[in-house]
Amino acid sequence: APSHFAVRRPDLVRKCGQLWFDPGEPAVHDQAIAVMRDVVRRYDVDAVHIDDFFYPYPDTCTSFPDSATYRRYQQGGGALSLGDWRRDNVNRFVERMYRAVHEERATARVGISPFGIWRPGNPAGITGLDAFGTIYADSRRWLQSGWVDYFAPQLYWSIASSGQSFPALLGWWAQQNTMRRHLWPGLASYRIGTDPGPFSAAEIPSQVALVREAAATSGGATGSILYNATSVRTNRLGFATALAGGLYAGGAIPPATTWLDGTAPAALALTVVPSGSSLQVTTSASGDAWWWLLRWRVNGAWRQRLVPSTQRTVDIAASGVDGVVVNAVDRVGNASADAVWRP
């Protein structure tokens, strides 16, 4: 379209396999940040997420045509090598994006899902693409600088993989998480039953279990992300059913992003009224609540449900219920004190 930024500013576009905006051009940064600000300002988004594309991957572009941009940088007194300059372009954009999003909305989270290997040999025995040196993504720096609220390295390999060990990479990223940001690795559900190297139906549930074990370690993962949605919707080899009936059987509150807002919402008022074979659970309104967490104990076993704050009443089966607890949950995951009912 004539209004497209690439049409209006062809001087910023580089062709290499596809069309790319040159990360070395300040106007490219300005445009991308302006678009993100506009989206966050006008739409009720929970987060801004960017994927693993920075400079092109070498399988699509072997020599990015930015020599004129780099020469202009050098003529202006710049002394960084080409690789360091490219990484600096990406680093400055990531930092600026993080600050800009929060200037527009303090509770909007910023996340990145980089290639799962920072550099080969980190940790020892890891082989594969050097994202630091080929797409100029110094993803460890973004995590350790606190320029993300959640970090989702694409750990798209199996537990048994030798050169790209899922457990080894998971543990290594936890060690790098010195700012204690949310570490939510990406899991390759798209590989279940498909080439290359098809996963079994048990692979993803096993990885989820490892992630949960890692949550107990310092800086460890507190969740995971399945890629992609199609594999979940089509329930490849029944893996989604297995998760729903097992590891994902109960709802969960997303971990609180306390560095954005550490104040818990006010406790809810709770009313529980018997109604035939059901109990009608009603909570008060709370201006800070985005969700409310409903937990109830049936014959000694807890069940739970996460309910939108716009819904004030939920009916549960009364049989065997010996306690009900509700909490308000705000937009960044802070939970209020318990409101408790006992029969």
Model feature map: region roles:
Residues 1-42, 134:
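Active-site-adjacent "subsite" loops/lids of carbohydrate-active enzymes
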Residues 71-125, 129-195:
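Glycoside hydrolase catalytic-domain groove-lining segments
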Residues 1-15, 52-77, 123-130:
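Aromatic- and acidic-residue-enriched segments that line the glycan-binding/catalytic groove
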Residues 284-299, 321:
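Solvent-exposed loop/turn segments flanking beta-strands in beta-repeat/beta-sandwich domains
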Residues 316-335:
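Beta-strand-rich modules
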Residues 243, 248-287, 334-343:
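Pro/Thr/Ser/Gly-rich low-complexity, intrinsically disordered linker/stalk tracts
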Residues 139-140, 144-162, 173-260:
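Substrate-binding cleft of secreted/luminal carbohydrate-active enzymes
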Residues 304-310:
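Short beta-strand segments within Ig-like beta-sandwich modules, predominantly Fibronectin type-III
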